[in-house]
Amino acid sequence: VPTRAVSSLPWRDVIVATGATDRVLPVPGWTLPGVYTLGGAQVALKYQGCAIGDAVVFAGTGPLLYLVACQYAKAGANVVAVLDTAPASARYKAAPAMLGQPAVMAKGLALVAWLKLHGIPMHHGVRLLCAEGNAAIEQLVWQDSAGREQRTACSAVGMGYALRPETQLADLLGCAFEFSALHRCHVPRIDAMRRSSVAGVYLAGDGAGIMGADAAEYSGELAALALLQDRQITVDADRLAALRQRLQKIERFRHALEVAFPFPDDWAAHAGDDLVVCRCENVTAGTLRQTAAECGVHELNRLKALCRVGMGRCQGRMCGAAAAEILAQAQSVPLAQVGRLRGQAPIKPLPLDVTEVIEPEDHHA
């Protein structure tokens, strides 16, 4: 929407590279000022040159947890603690498989070593209990691996449980989806060349599954080569084979990361009924459970229609994963069975003062 004008661009082929957003699992108090996603904390530092607080805790799990903590500490921020819900033993279990990508593994170990060398406390196997404070967060309450309750004073928290694919544009383009146990969500179905189920639509990067920056680059090139191939343009077969081989190695490493940083699949069972899951519409876990029980709901979009979860400004990007976990737990069904929140246009909010509609030119991109 440039200069308050709506325009459209005709296309014959399109490569969709929408990336990823944070996967968030709420805790009581997560709506307090000072509680951020890991990605939000990283954006504040990288693009605005500021920290989210003067005493920051990073919590959750996944490689991004340690990367952002390191970035903050190296920038001079006061990182109070790193709280990882994954047990330390998970790293040792995953280590043999992670050796398939020694350079990437070394980068991760270097982050942890740097934090340890600079005296930043790191705790593993924790459970986040709540964020407390009056006008803003003042402390994070958590349970250590021995089951003891701990309280860490802080002015800000960066929280996240790895990333989730941003798939709404692929959804609106009509792409077929399938459940991925690895990603714990539905992702667009693609072939080995990144073709979607829709002719002329190719998917690159984390928007089709979280694989990281290197894989995003390789998959983008692979999608471009597939597009050229489909236009009957000769491409380098050796390059195709090399790209696919690299992506296969990264995918094996990705499976190892899931072992090293497991999703806390008991989160929904511990989520209290008063926990706000959808902050846009102020929908609690109790409302989700009650609606599911009273109306016999087993599908996420039906739940959305009945209680407005995921209908707010974020269109479910913030609450969709958590709502799916709650529904599956409440109805004792597999996560794959509850489905996914369907994308709705407009994907992002539009200004009300749009003044002009620009008609598309008569050409194909």
For each feature predicted by the language model, list its residue ranges.
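Residues forming the flavin
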Residues: 1-307, 311-313, 317-326, 330-365
